[in-house]
Amino acid sequence: MFNLIRRSAEWGGKTLVLESGKIARQASGAVMVSYAGTTVLATVVTGKTKEPVDFLPLTVQFVAKSYAVGKIPGGFLKREGKPSDRETLISRLIDRSIRPLFPAGFYDEISIVCNLLSYDTVTPPEVTALVGATAALSISGVPFNGLVVGARVGYLPSEGKYLLNASADEMLCSSLDLFLSGNEDSVLMVESEASELSESQMLGAITFGHQHCQEVINLIKEFSHESGQTPIDFIPHDISSLVSDIESSYKEDFSLAYSNTIKKERVLKLEELRGKVLSEVADKYSAGDVECSDQDIVTALKTFERSLVRSKIIDTSSRIDGRAFDEIRDIEIEVDVLPKAHGSALFTRGNTQALVVTALGTPQDEQIVDDLDGDRRENFLLHYNFPPYAVGESAALRAPGRREIGHGKLAWRAIRYVLPEKSDFPYTIRVVSEITESDGSSSMATVCGASLALMDTGVPIKSPVAGIAMGLIKEDDRFIILSDILGDEDHLGDMDFKVAGTAEGVTALQMDMKISGIDIDIIEKALLQAKDGRMHILSKMNAVIQESRNRIKNHAPRIESIFINKDKIRNVIGSGGKNIRDICEKTGAKIEIIQDGTVMIYAVNNEAVEYAKSMIMDIVTEPEIGKVFEGTVVEIMKFGAFVSFLGGKKGLVHISEIRNEHISSVGSVISLNDKVKVLVIGIDREHIQLSMRRVDQESGEPIDGELYNIRKNSFSDDSCGSTGGSSFKESYNPNSRHGSHEKKRSGGSSRSSRRNSNGPNYYREDLPSSNGFGNNNRSFSNSRNGHDVPRKPRFF
């Protein structure tokens, strides 16, 4: 029933298996790829387009199934829906790797779908998916010029060792995360982020990865040969005579148009000429005997324009705007351009302009990413917006597409390394790049603008980051590398090579090809030329702002973290969240408590942060003998007053500790809700004894000698309101039916000396030793039961 084809090989210490003929047999080509514990089903379907087109309608979709890791999708529908950013980025990696290998003029519709069916969270799924896509193309019959394989490369600088398809844990120690694809002879695509690596280290990683791709290319060759499927013979339509006719009639006009250095004028003139060519050539051929379609004319015109611009550059080293091959366009930089933004910068390079804005948020603003590798929180976001007006087009605004997501991720990679650690700067950082003009290299303008905006915000980045886009014109063995390419040079050239980094090294690298790859020598030259351009741009940036501002804007949110004892977390929260709600309502701050005792305070200004901080510290601070606090009278009794302080702690001010002189009634001196200053003079577990008379109620300072007397343990019974030198110790039980005061002799037993179950007993504190506060846990013999129990501190 099944015509099963199977091939396997060891690659990077793991087993790679290719299978076909069993699943998805209705597709033009289908391959099940297993690499270690990761399995991808790659399918290719091709067919004729409904209408003639002059481009390759290639669609690549990478779909990560939740069941691949045994998960059920979140959300109401509980099924896969809109592609995640990661799925989009992997789809782009595959597309950019294989697109250059289709023959020119082949315009059949091609759909490639890579379903991630099983994922071990260790093996890179993008590597497995690209192998599957290439293998499926090789047995689909689609004309495809060569085989392409991808590899993920890491680097351990301490060992000088490169890693192949390493696990996520291994990559944690890596200073490089690079994905590249290549065929037998050359490199086709690179996407990477790095920790300020040198150009030679980056080149070494590319060489290392390309060498290891050859092992799998040979495996796919064997697999394809066994299938017996050969690509169809594609013979492109011959339009050479049409190209010659256009060149002879319109070369001068197009040469003049392309010599205009002002993009807006150049674009308008070129559009006018193209319309003229399409009309006149169509009329000419319709009157003759030679059949010529509109698609043929468009293709011939593109071929002519490409040849015209490329030959001028490679023959004369003269570019469209008159610059030298390594010359950077004029740069203008402004910072702090938006007064209410937390940070902003306007970066203009020629006719490319990016308005980059930074917003700071709290950790509660972090993006929650639901990923197959596990949910995570992202505190750095970079969004890239490319509206139609940036290139003078009239079109509706749409949601971010693959291009916007890809460009934003490249800039994110370039900036991430220089950001401070979260422990040093706990803010959530969002950077938004609004491309207001575009004539090439808008993603690298985003990198420069993001670095400037972050410094304007006051984010303490390690170093400024700049980016530059390089181009390539290659004809046979002749080639020229262009610095800071224009949009037309990108469109008509052979390579888009973007490098971002600091003065110390590379932080991001991206390369896309329009031809079937380039060798390592060209990549090396491009890297070195890009370094010179990057240093030039950094010098322009440093002339405006060299380092981050030493403080964030006044209207930016404030964040402060404090550490409390883990045992005090429940006190801060309070019963049913009462305390923490009270703090938030009174201060306007947001509070986040982490299990390790870290308390994060978020507020719109410093005053709110300090207020919330003081309220929290009041709750968690333990009262100390000899310390003065401000409190509120919450209850008045015959024998004294209860005062609430330190976020709800209660202590008793005995009637003898309210005033130095005798008072007959507590209520005649103080009232409920009075704000008073109190001195802690004794502590017995939860019971706190306070004094008002020992504190200056105006200044809050202890009265001269009183603090010394407490610490020297020199209180007399007379000063506490007892009789002479009596050995009687007073205790108070507010619920006792025997009255407010009961007396017992030291060491004696009485019914009132025992703690009453109906309410707490308050005892005069034992006199502390001369060098401390005494030991309240000393034991004595209880004559009632004969057991030693902790001695109760006496109540003053």
Curated annotation (Swiss-Prot):
This is Polyribonucleotide nucleotidyltransferase. It is an enzyme of class 2 (transferase). PROSITE patterns: KH_TYPE_1, S1. It comes from the Bacteria. The gene is pnp. One of its GO terms (molecular function) is RNA binding. Keywords: Cytoplasm, Magnesium, Metal-binding, Nucleotidyltransferase, RNA-binding, Transferase. The lineage of its organism: Bacteria, Pseudomonadati, Pseudomonadota, Alphaproteobacteria, Rickettsiales. Belongs to the polyribonucleotide nucleotidyltransferase family. Residues 557-616 form the KH domain. HAMAP family: PNPase. Residues 717-728, 747-759, 769-784 have a biased composition (Low complexity).
